[in-house]
């Protein structure tokens, strides 16, 4: 048997979809260094420690999150594994060529379900800004309809049957405090105006 150091980790820290300075000046390389290199990595490391030697050791990340959800004895595992999943989804929800408006089917669905793009954008911004404490704002497909949702802490739509997340905004303080201090609305507006990856959301819509 290979020593632990030589074995592949069950859950790995996925590479960023872009360089660590690619989101400048809206999200700095310094923020990415802490957020991705420290926080996201710590969630990965903690998850691997918790599943080692258990029946979840070879499970997929999504299966780990779902298996731990709602179980008091697996709260630590849920928090860490869900944060791995949420963060990976968040990085993909951003793009150095993002912002603006979506096109095609996604824009049509947004107009149908929210009235117009401006109303949707305002709803998503409000969800992100008003989330009390740490958490996430999401665009989800729920029962065939697009909706904006908030989740606290590590909670995720992944564990809700029938819900399909399309994109997310991280509003934990570590996502923005280095660059924006307590100005969460400025961070949220920068994400929506300059960074949100509509192509990723459109792919998730299908």
Locate the predicted segments by residue.
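Feature for soluble, non-membrane regions of globular proteins
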Residues: 2-206
């Amino acid at each position: 048997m290979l020593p632990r150091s030589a074995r592949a980790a069950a859950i790995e820290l996925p590479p960023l979809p872009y360089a660590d300075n690619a989101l400048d000046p809206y999200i700095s390389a310094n923020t990415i260094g802490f957020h991705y290199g420290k926080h996201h990595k710590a969630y990965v490391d903690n998850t691997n420690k918790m599943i080692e030697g258990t029946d979840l050791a070879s499970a997929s990340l999504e299966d780990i999150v779902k298996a731990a959800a709602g179980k008091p004895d697996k709260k630590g595992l849920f928090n860490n594994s869900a944060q791995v999943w949420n963060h990976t989804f968040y990085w993909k929800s951003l793009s150095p060529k993002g912002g603006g408006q979506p096109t095609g089917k996604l824009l049509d669905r947004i107009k149908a379900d929210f009235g117009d793009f401006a109303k949707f954008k305002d709803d998503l911004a409000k969800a992100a800004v008003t989330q009390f404490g740490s958490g996430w704002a999401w665009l989800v497909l729920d029962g065939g309809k697009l909706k904006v949702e908030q989740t606290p802490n590590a909670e995720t739509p992944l564990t809700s049957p029938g819900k399909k997340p399309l994109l997310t905004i991280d509003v934990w303080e570590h996502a923005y405090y280095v660059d924006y201090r307590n100005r969460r609305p400025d961070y949220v507006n920068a994400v929506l105006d300059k960074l949100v990856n509509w192509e990723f959301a459109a792919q998730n819509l299908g």
